[in-house]
Amino acid sequence: VRIRMPIEDKLSDKNLLTKLLKYDYLINFVNSKTDVYKLSEFVGEIVRDFKPGIYNAVHSNPLSTKEVVEILKDYNLVNEKWNFIPYDELDIKANRSNCVLSNHKSSTVFNFDWGDEEVYLRLNASLIEKRKEWKNEL
């Protein structure tokens, strides 16, 4: 099972949304993403009806970094220092990859609906926003 850029409703170190909030300089690539809760549903399908193979566990209709940032802004998840720069200006130690994977095989072999990427990004962002509000109320 292959995943790309995991997203979830917790601000964990591996969560793409956490990473974007921490970075000041961003590049605008389109990449596939994987909601970790939807991934667990998919793994359940594999367990129930195992069929060997390599399966891409990613959502349909991948979004660009700019589109993801706009969604985060809709939920008051913002880094005021965000600045989109060309890839060659990014100060990095290792090259970055941009990768769009097809979920066709995982969808058809297991009759699994990965759903639209934007829906899962909005769901996770809204839960993070609510969690921040709850902490402020305590």
Q: PLM features: what roles do these ranges have?
A:
Residues 31-34, 63, 101:
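Residue-level signal for the nucleotide or nucleotide-sugar donor/cofactor binding architecture
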Residues 1-38:
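NAD(P)-dependent short-chain dehydrogenase/reductase
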Residues 107, 111-138:
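Amphipathic terminal alpha-helices
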